Each structure stands twice: as structure tokens, then as C-alpha cells.
Amino acid sequence: MKRSGALAAMALLIAGVASAQFGRGYNASLSARMARPDSFDGRFHYCRGQYRMNPTGDGGSWLTDYPLADIDLSIRLAELTKMRVGFDAPGQPQHLIVPLTGAELFKCPMIMMQEVGRLFFSEEDVAQLRKYLLKGGFLWVDDFWGSYAWNAWATQIAKVFPPGEYPVIDLPADHPIFHTMFELKAIPQIPGIGYWRGSGGGTSERGADSAQVHARGISDRNGRLMVLMTHNTDVSDSWEREGEDPNYFYRFSVEGYQVAMNVLIYVMTH
């Protein structure tokens, strides 16, 4: 099968698998799963970074989209790839909350953090996160909108990687992360479902200040991407809200899962 045909088939599979389970629902009151030394067994576990809050920032908190984004992405990863994903005996994904200063951080191939416009890194966070990323870890930050949130985040990540040493770049279209499983031309603009409904189908949550999606990154000395920043989009909402509205699902969730599969395959192969 030609690559384009394979990609089209995979897109249909994403839609078909999810449609078969549309609205399946999960218990959002599930107790938080804090990472422990015995939480890791060689399988993939979605790790959500727990960060300190900046009172002068812009956005929600590290709990945004929890736990459904973590659950749904773990399930789709198991369905759409051959990756071994951790599930418990009742069949729930073993997604984990990981404090940035915990030793468990180093057992996570990837850390996901949402709404980082309100994040604050302490000196201890900075030292630990820098060590984790330079040793092969990966950080994906998502769902922060507009120039104020960007500047707040840029100030914090500069503590970890001063831009003169490790510059932030706009990822070029030929970067491998856009081509690992699906051929992506760009990161799509995905709004939170509440904004999308309330605005009558709008996608830019900060108007003209967030009209353009940015896919930015920080790489190590060997060119390995260590930090992915998807700015002016809410990719994780496309996972969390996949069962709420079929129109939102077909418009945004299929693309959101394509982005996620590409990122995760890049992480696990680099």
C-alpha cells in the first residue's frame, strides 16, 4: 500500500475505533494516580507533570484536562500502535501524576504539561528538569494561548535552558516529528470545546493574539528534540472531549490523535 493510502486508512481507523466507542464515558472522579517507584513496569505510562503555579501568569493549572485526556490518549495509543501501554487489572490505563522534583520523573519517557502560562519553576525544578531532559527525557507543553502566556512560559523555560545556550526554534516542516506515522503539514489549531461552542465554531481563543499556531522546540547538542511547545492550540482537549460531541470529534479529535501518535512515536524512537 502506498504511504498516502496507508495514512488515509489509519485516519479512518482512528475515526472508526472512536466512533464505535463514542460517548463511552469514564469516571472523571477517579482518584489521582501519583507516581511511585513501583508504578513502572516497562510498559508506557502517560506521565502528567505537576508544577507550581505562578499567580501572575495566564491560564488554568497542571490539572487541566485531567484525567480524561490521559485516559483516552493511553487507550488510543494501545489501539493504534504496537506500543505496550500499562493497564491495571480492571482495564484502566495506568496514567501517572509526576512531581517535577520526584525521582519517578526519570522513569517517564515523556512528561506532558498543560496551561503552562501559569507555571513557575523553582531552582529545584530547574535543576531536575534540565537533568531529565539532557539525559534523554521529553517535555510536551500544550494549551497556552496568546503573547502574554507565551512570554510567561518563555521566562520559565529559559531558567532551564537559557536561549543563548539552547535556543527556542520554530520547527520546520521537514522535522521528523511531523512525519513519524502521519504526514502532517502543521500542528492544527484545536480550541477547547467550550470556546468552540460558545463562539459559534471559532478556533482562536485569544482572537487576533492567538490566530497563528506555533510548533516550537528546544533540541540538544545532537539535534534530538527535548521540548515540544504547541502554542495557540489545545491538542489535549481533542482527546479529553472526544466523546462529548460528534461534530467536535470529527473536526478536531482525529487530527489531535494524529499529532499525538507522531509525537509519541518520535519520543519512543529518539
Task: Locate the predicted segments by residue.
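Aromatic-Pro/Gly-enriched surface loop or interdomain linker
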Residues: A20-M110, V116-G117, D234-H270
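Short alpha-beta junction capping motif
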Residues: Y46, L105-N151
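Extracellular/periplasmic catalytic domains that process cell-envelope and extracellular macromolecules
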Residues: P37-G42, G102-K107, Y132-L134, P162, ...
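An acidic, glycine-rich "communication" segment
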Residues: Y26-A28, D41, N54-G57, W150-R241, ...
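Extracytoplasmic/secreted proteins, especially bacterial periplasmic and envelope-associated proteins
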Residues: L68, D72, R76, E124, ...
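N-terminal signal peptide c-region/cleavage motif recognized by signal peptidases
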Residues: A15-V17
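Bacterial N-terminal signal peptides that target proteins for export
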Residues: M1-A9
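Surface-exposed patches in mature extracellular/periplasmic domains of secreted proteins
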Residues: M83-V98, V141-G146, E165-D174
